Regions:
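Conserved small/polar residues in nucleotide/adenosyl-binding loops
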Residues: 134-136
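Glycine-/Pro-rich loop/turn segments that contact NAD(P) or position catalytic residues
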Residues: 120-132
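Acidic-glycine-rich active-site phosphate/pyrophosphate-binding loop
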Residues: 108-123
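An N-terminal-biased, well-structured beta-alpha scaffold segment characteristic
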Residues: 2-110
Length: 136
């Protein structure tokens, strides 16, 4: 599967969907990983570290969304990203859909498969992705 890691566009969002160590594991599992140029800069991760981990660095979000089956983000897509989402593309991010009916409708209309981190539940009922990302 081709997995895309776009640069976050939300103001003051410096995290990135996957760190280089995660890219290594994905590549070792047979996936191709595309990382948007500069995606990790806000987290202190440069493009070279992603390249060394096995990712291909691409210039822009259009290429990430255009080539990837799975998009891994931190925050919900904004208006500029919504128009890039393709039918049956998997979007994995904190979506906060209860607070944003417009985004919910836009994702439904795009016919993507949207997975909200905050709704992933363990068998014991815990919500592990509501912990700090440092623990995940």
């Amino acid at each position: 599967m081709i997995i895309g890691i776009p640069k976050e566009v939300k103001v003051r969002e410096y995290r990135v969907g996957v760190v280089p160590a995660g890219v290594v594991k994905l590549v070792e599992s047979g996936h191709q990983v595309l990382v948007q140029q500069g995606a990790g800069i806000g987290s202190g991760l440069n493009d070279q570290s992603y390249h060394q981990a096995g990712a291909q660095i691409v210039a822009n979000a259009e290429e990430i969304y255009g080539r990837s089956k799975l998009i891994v983000k931190v925050k919900e897509p904004d208006e500029s990203e919504i128009e890039l989402i393709q039918e049956n593309q998997i979007i994995y991010a904190y979506l906060h859909l209860a607070a944003n009916p417009r985004l919910t409708q836009q994702l439904l209309e795009s016919k993507c498969i949207a997975v909200a981190y905050e709704t992933i539940q363990q068998p014991d009922g815990s919500l592990p992705l509501l912990l700090s990302l440092i623990h995940i």
